[in-house]
């Protein structure tokens, strides 16, 4: 099952904490931003105990590396909670959603809000 959410045009919200956090996974902000704006597949949606919605998306960096990104929206901006290289299971889910093993998409699968 995939979920759709419009990222909007408010950009990304970064601070020292989440920049440091993704750096521990060998990532930079540009990697994560590209993964979320370059035809990602959103594979999970949940609401935290505090009521904040969270999405889990898988998308490619500019070099084709697939990332798993947990994110939310605060105001008009995307706030990345964490990001790291996608596990094989998520890579397979991404490829399947894109229409094949190589991720080449013919059409996106149906989405649910």
Please report, for each region that a protein language model flagged, where it lies by residue.
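Ribonuclease/tRNase effector modules and their secretory precursors
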Residues: 1-113
